[in-house]
Amino acid sequence: MAHKKGASSSRNGRDSNAQRLGVKRFGGQSVSAGEILVRQRGTHFHPGVNVGRGGDDTLFALSAGAVEFGTKRGRKTVNIVPAAAEA
């Protein structure tokens, strides 16, 4: 095996694509069922009322309503407050 880097070779030149993580819908925004709220690695935000968690820890809305961020037992949670029923 060569231990010298031969002519015009380089050990650099690799980089990974960004994962585009973060909050996608912020507090007070109205969402419909199935919309992604937070993309994350691990549970930085925990699912609350009307919020589901995917296999990659993505949080998504289970029903339509307004997004609400809060804390419960010292954990950051994301809830969906259902929109008021139309009369």
Curated annotation (Swiss-Prot):
The record's Pfam families line, in alphabetical order, gives: Ribosomal_L27 (PF01016)
> What molecular function terms (GO) are annotated for this protein?
structural constituent of ribosome
GO CC terms of this entry: cytosolic large ribosomal subunit
Q: Where is this region: Disordered?
A: 1-25
Q: Which Gene3D superfamilies match?
A: 2.40.50.100
Which segments show compositional bias classed as Polar residues? 7-19
Q: Which controlled-vocabulary keywords does the entry list?
A: Ribonucleoprotein, Ribosomal protein
- What highest taxon heads this organism's lineage? Bacteria
What are the recorded Gene Ontology BP terms? translation
Give the family, as the similarity comment puts it.
Belongs to the bacterial ribosomal protein bL27 family.
UniProt-recorded name of the protein: Large ribosomal subunit protein bL27
The scientific name of the source species is Rhodococcus jostii (strain RHA1)
Q: Which gene encodes it?
A: rpmA
